[in-house]
Structures are given as C-alpha cells and as structure tokens.
Design a protein with these regions (language model features):
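Outer membrane beta-barrel
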Residues: 17-177, 184-189, 193-202, 277-283, ...
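Short glycine/proline-enriched turns and hinge-like loops at secondary-structure junctions
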Residues: 161, 181-184, 316, 349-351
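Cleavable N-terminal export/targeting peptides
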Residues: 1-11
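Outer-membrane beta-barrel pore domains
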Residues: 41-42, 68, 98, 200-363
Length: 363
C-alpha cells in the first residue's frame, strides 16, 4: 500500500479549494499612472499621480446569483463596487449593494472603456462624479441601493438576436458611496434604452429624482434640497466606430452666496445646470509584424463639450471644451492615452489648455 503524509493530504485539499475558487471567482484590476499639465488664467500646474489602483473580484455563487467586490487604493483606499445580482430571467434581474446608478449612457462605462481620460463636464457635474452640490461622497457615478434591470424585447437583425428594449430602475439612499443615509427620503433613478432594429445603435432616456442635505461653505445646513437630473442621448458603437451624444440637465437647490447669519434666514435658490457633448472615435487594428504575434489598436478621438453651471445666473457664461485624443493599446494589457483640451470658459477671450498623458496596466 502506498501511504500519504499529512502534508500531502493538506496540499491536495488546498489545491482543490483553490480550483473551486478559480471556477467561481475572477480576480483582476488595473493601475492608472497620469501626468497632467494645465494652464488657465495665467496659472499653471504640473501634476503626476497614481490616479487609480483597482482590484476587482467578480464571480457567481450559483447559476442565478452573481457578485462583485471592487476597491480602489489610489489616492486613498475606498470601496467602489459591492453588490449581489440575482438573475431571475432576461426580463428581471435584481441588484443590491453599491454600484453605478442607471443614469446617462456614459456613466455605464468603466474608465478602461472611456474614450478620453476625463468624462464630459456635464456628466461629471450631474452623474455623481464631481457633483454640483459639492458633496464628495457623490463619487464614481455610484450609489447604495437596489435596482431592477432587464431586457423587455429582442429581435433578430441579420440573423443575430439583439435587445430592442432594455430598462433599469433603482431606489437609492441618495448620499453617495461608503456613507449611511441621513434623511428619510430615498432617491429614484431610471433609464430606458431603445434599439430601433439597428445593430449597435441605441437611444437612451434617463432621470434621477432625489433630495440631499444642502451644504454651505462645506458645512451642513440641515435643510433638504432638490437634486433632479434628466438625460437623453444616442450612441452608435460597432467596435470600430463609436459616435455618442447626450444632453443632460439638472435642477439643484443650493445655498445662496450671501445667506443671513441667522440659520432661519438661509436663502436657498435653484440652480439649473445643463450641457451636452458629442464624441467620435475610430479603432485601427494592426499587427507588429510577421514575427510578432501580438496585435495593437489605435483610436483617434474628438469631442465637443458644452456646459453651463447655472442657467439662471446671467453672470455664469458657458464653459466649452474642445478635446482631441489618441488611445493606443500596444497589447491587450497596456493602454497609453494622450489628450489635449482647449478650454473656453467664463470669458469669451479666456482660454485654458490641458495636456494629459496616462498609462494603464491591466491585469
């Protein structure tokens, strides 16, 4: 008889456990190293940083249940995604936890899939990235809550089944990520996407209706204000061409610039924020040569980006950004981006310039 030592048995058990983990969990992530030069109004800055350092766990607990846990370690450790998704059928899936809200088209995209290094101005301001409210927990376009999603209708186009009507609707705490809800009200967000029997083409409409605790000079006022958002747009993306445009608007109650020292005299005024953008890019796919099996991809991108912080304020003029960029994947784990933006803002004759270079390493 052949005997097995206790160490051999333990090693075999460890291998079996690891094999089961690999069958149900995928581990990935990426790191973004960025350099940015900015010049505006006579002021210059030159910044190098590790912008993101993501670690991402995805997996399935069963045929019907998926999960995701994603953290970011730059510039400070924080939880990005933490949710469980139950797939009842194609018409209904239930997602619970912290995740992206169903609002706008661009908000769906991971930074690794985004055409330029920065979101459009109005997406940042109204989709929960650098929110007009000034609340830092509105971050990464995410909230804590629950959401129903599904595909309500599909059709065959040139022999391939494509979704015609998709939806997402959720109930959220309304305070952003990694924080507890501090008000009785809950926020609602919804998005619907329609493909008009054209493969790779979608039309989208979405809304967000909520309240938040208004800040003044960085401190809570104890007063709840409206935080309403609306978006409509379209996108064509056939893995070669991408063309997308969206109009986004929002109504946000803000504390006035000169409130009375008496808290009872605090002046709250609505700000009507709006903007739109149009972006286009095309992928070139080519090899390194006959002796190198790897492929590389290159995408030039152009974007027009209009934004106005407060339409009700006659002194607040539009901010218009003209961006051009190159996105290069020398191989599937490495991305290099180079972006230039001409910024026309606040005064017609005042221009700013931003040059950004970013290297992403995916694992």
């Amino acid at each position: 008889m052949v005997g097995f030592s206790q160490d051999t048995i333990s090693k075999k058990k460890s291998q079996d456990v690891w094999q089961q983990v690999k069958e149900h969990v995928s581990i990935g992530g990426w790191v973004d190293a960025q350099y940015m030069y900015d010049k505006a109004g006579g002021v210059q800055s030159s910044v190098m940083q590790i912008r993101r350092a993501r670690l991402d766990f995805k997996g399935s607990l069963s045929k019907w249940v998926d999960f995701r846990l994603q953290g970011d370690f730059a510039p400070n450790p924080r939880l990005i995604d933490a949710y469980v998704k139950v797939n009842f059928c194609q018409y209904v899936q239930l997602q619970v936890g912290q995740f992206k809200i169903p609002f706008s088209i661009e908000n769906k995209y991971s930074p690794l899939d985004l055409e330029l290094t920065e979101n459009a101005q109005v997406i940042s301001a109204l989709s929960g990235y650098k929110d007009v409210t000034g609340i830092s927990s509105y971050s990464n376009g995410r909230e804590i809550g629950l959401m129903l999603t599904g595909t309500l209708a599909s059709a065959k186009v040139r022999g391939e089944k494509i979704p015609i009507l998709k939806y997402g609707v959720g109930l959220f705490g309304g305070n952003g990520i990694n924080v507890k809800t501090d008000n009785m009200a809950k926020d609602i967000s919804a998005r619907i996407e329609f493909s008009p029997f054209v493969k790779n083409m979608i039309f989208s409409a979405s809304g967000y209706w909520g309240k938040y605790n208004i800040l003044y000079d960085g401190a809570s006022t104890g007063v709840d204000g409206r935080r309403y958002r609306y978006a409509a747009g379209a996108e064509y993306n056939d893995k070669k061409w991408v063309v997308r445009g969206e109009y986004v608007a929002g109504l946000t109650d803000l504390a006035s610039l000169n409130p009375s020292p008496d808290p009872d005299g605090l002046v709250v005024e609505p700000a009507f924020t709006q903007g739109f953008y149009v972006i286009a890019g095309y992928w070139f796919d080519f090899g390194w040569g006959k002796d190198i099996p790897m492929r590389q991809k290159l995408r030039p991108v152009l974007r027009f980006d209009y934004y106005r912080y407060n339409q009700h304020d006659a002194f607040n003029v539009p901010s218009i950004y003209y961006s051009a960029g190159l996105e290069w994947w020398p191989e599937r784990h490495v991305r290099v981006q180079l972006n230039y933006t001409l910024k026309q803002r606040y005064q017609i004759d005042q221009f700013g310039h931003t040059l950004t270079a970013m290297v992403s390493v995916k694992f």
